Amino acid sequence: MAQDISFNVRSNNGDPLRVGAWRFEGDGSGPKVHLQAGVHADEIAGMLVLHLLMQRLQVAEAEGRLKSQVTVVPQANPLGIGQFRQGRLLGRFHDATGHNFNRGFDQSAAMNPPSTNIQEWQKSLVQLASSADVMLDLHTDDEALPYLYVHRSFWPRGRELAAAMKMDVAIIWDDGGDGSFENAVQDFHGVRVDRFSGRRSRGYPDCRNRFVTSFPARHAGRPIVRDRETGVP
């Protein structure tokens, strides 16, 4: 049975807002996994995916098939989910300050104590994910090919994840300093040194493969690029 590890953050007027979080223990033989969605609170698809996944995880745990400890935060941003204007959900930016909800996580995580409710919320999310071996932060685009956004240090191992998720494109990023959630978690684990060259990965002069790798491109339903390592089109 999932353990409720939810926590509260302060709203703009100081009232408590709940961040729902649950943990499935598994048998401990697999890696620790952290899954979350809704940092940008108007990006709905990931929230739905994780709510449905929790049902499957509950069944798998009950049947003794779950190997990993899995933490799920299906709607990570109670501050943004309540922001409406003329009937439209505005969940990308904090209405009171204009702050992008997925920026500044690195600064917030370093504060002791955080100064604002946004910083408290961001630091709490980073701390919750800090012990994970695998972390996926789900976002939704308006209109785009399915893509995986992955740090260079996890490539080419990330091809297996891209194949499993049936992605068309993998966007490979270096340390950019934008303070996004994934950037802050990377920093927490010290993934600053490029694992292939043994040097810091800020500002590669050779950026031929820095931004986009086709995986796998499709045209008229037929794969153009095939993953030779996994054999998955």
Task: Identify the role of each PLM range.
Residues 1-233:
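Structured catalytic-domain cores with a bias toward divalent-metal coordination
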